[in-house]
Amino acid sequence: MGVFMRDEGRMETEDIILGKAKYEDWRSIYRNVWSRPETAEYMVWKVTADEDGARERIQRTIVWQETHDAWLVYERGSGQAIGFAGVEETEPHIYHETGIALGPEYVGRGYGKQILRLLMEYCISLDGQEFYYSTRAGNLASRALALSCGLTYHHSERRTDQRSGKTYELEIYKKNLESVGVGYEAG
């Protein structure tokens, strides 16, 4: 069961917490996510090369999260920052996820499903009616996550990777939120 604590800027499930970044998170998010090429592969960000870069990046992340619906993902048991996630309202009542990333050691534990369900429930709490999720066509784990959470394929768009200049297919998945709950209560 998920819980929202808006006054504290966080959401929780049994295994994870979505919370706003703090400076001291730089080391764990760097080690678990930002330094990992396998995590960046299907994303639109570049790997952070060193600890100094991670310290600078966490400062930018903190500033960004102050004005956006974006969070770090913390593993409840260890308290470590193991990923990030976010959403944005693109039109009234229409939300898009803005990226979900987990460090490779944390994939396959059900955390992605918990994150995606929390994001959808958060959007419902904001009177969201449609939720969109996107993934690169080759990212089979991300596609499986979308389908496992009840999203359906909507359409594809050809995009250009700003890092490499190569084109790729971005698959867009959709779920109507007003008619179907996602298994969590807002508190």
Residue ranges, per PLM feature:
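Acyl-donor (CoA/ACP) binding surface of acyl/acetyltransferases
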Residues: 1-28, 32-36, 74-187
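Hydrophobic residues in alpha-helical segments
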Residues: 33, 43, 62-65
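Conserved GNAT-fold acetyl-CoA-binding loop/helix
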Residues: 38-60
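Secondary-structure boundary/capping positions in well-ordered alpha/beta enzyme cores
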Residues: 46, 68, 126-130
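A short helix-loop-beta-strand connector motif used in the catalytic cores of GNAT acetyltransferases and
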Residues: 59-72
